A protein has these predicted regions:
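Active-site helix of classical SDR
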Residues: 105, 141
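Residue(s) in the substrate-gating loop at a strand-loop-helix junction
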Residues: 125
Length: 218
């Protein structure tokens, strides 16, 4: 998504815990001649509330405002019966997939209110819209994602130029998909680049006024 947004003129802020991976994306964006990105190492699993506020202050000083926020970080957690999931594993999934997403969103809202056209995209899942056995904490976290999106969208409706929507990527050629379905041929699934149209639509001005909706990328 970052490379696609950059190719359409966005100045992308790459936030995540694996700096080496972020640098690879940064280099690809630079090599393509797109607007210079920024790398922000940040561990969503261990970050405390005050660190999200400090991040927002840093970004305000560096960039002034935020026009778009894509929540794309998730961990799968154990795929097993609920009774067999440890409290530690459940809380870890909820921390990355829900708590950190909430704190990052609320920290960024003041910067997004400075934009005349701002968009928040929450990455959901089919198991966040209909529960399925053995999807455990991941399914619960994606239901929470949809709930956060809907609640925030209703609060923003008519009060802000910010819109919030969710996207279910569907079966995509990712490492998480391979972990969830180890026997599946990944070549049967589209790449991330192939499901970008809905993300571009929601992040761009064409979706102004579209708020509180759940989209499927496929």
């Amino acid at each position: 998504a970052a490379k696609t947004f950059a190719a359409h003129g966005a100045t992308v802020l790459l936030l995540g815990k694996t700096e080496e991976y972020l640098n690879e994306i940064y280099d690809a964006i630079e090599a393509a001649g797109h607007p210079q990105a920024a790398v922000i190492p940040f561990n969503l699993e261990t970050a405390q509330p005050h660190q999200f506020e400090e991040l927002a202050a840093t970004l305000e000083n560096e960039f002034g405002r935020i026009d778009g926020l894509l929540h794309n970080a998730s961990i799968l957690g154990p795929r097993s019966p609920m009774q067999q999931i440890s409290g530690e594993n459940f809380m870890r999934v909820m921390q990355v997939n829900v708590n950190a997403m909430f704190m990052l969103t609320t920290a960024m809202l003041p910067l997004m209110k400075l934009s005349s056209d701002a968009s928040i995209i929450f990455t959901s899942s089919s198991v966040g819209r209909k529960g399925r056995a053995y999807w455990g904490a991941y399914s619960v976290s994606k239901f929470a994602t949809e709930g956060l999106m809907q609640t925030l969208a209703d609060e923003l409706d008519g009060t802000s130029a910010i819109r919030a929507n969710s996207v279910n990527p569907g079966a995509t050629r990712t490492s998480m998909r391979a972990l969830a379905y180890p026997g599946e041929n990944p070549l049967n699934n589209p790449t991330g680049e192939e499901i970008m149209p809905v993300y571009l639509y929601l992040m761009g001005p064409d979706s102004a006024g579209v708020n509180g909706q759940a989209f499927d990328a496929q």
